[in-house]
From Swiss-Prot:
InterPro entries: ATPase_V1-cplx_f_g_su, ATPase_V1-cplx_fsu_bac/arc, ATPase_V1_fsu_sf. This is A-type ATP synthase subunit F. GO terms for molecular function: ATP binding; proton-transporting ATP synthase activity, rotational mechanism; proton-transporting ATPase activity, rotational mechanism. Belongs to the V-ATPase F subunit family. The lineage of its organism: Archaea, Methanobacteriati, Methanobacteriota, Thermococci, Thermococcales. It is a peripheral membrane protein. The gene is atpF. It is found in: Cell membrane. GO terms for cellular component: plasma membrane.
Amino acid sequence: MKIVVLGDKDTVLGFRLAGVHETYSFEDTTHEIERVRNKIMELIEREDVGVILITERLAQRVEIPDVAFPIILQIPDKYGSLYGEEQLREIVRRAIGVEIKR
């Protein structure tokens, strides 16, 4: 199963350097947001994609489909996290039924 990253060019570059082979960079424009939506739908249909990582700022601009597979996770970009810690807690709570607290 492949990991695919969607985000700004700097975040995508970091993941490429870490060994992720399939990455897509997008600018924060209206035209690009439509391309992001199309790319997400295309990736969901592919059987070889197991995880889609998308930057939080990009995810705020598009509606992320609620699908069981592939797993879609929001990640911080070069500016830091918007709300990633809370989202991770919610994912764990839904997956295993345990709430993580500090």
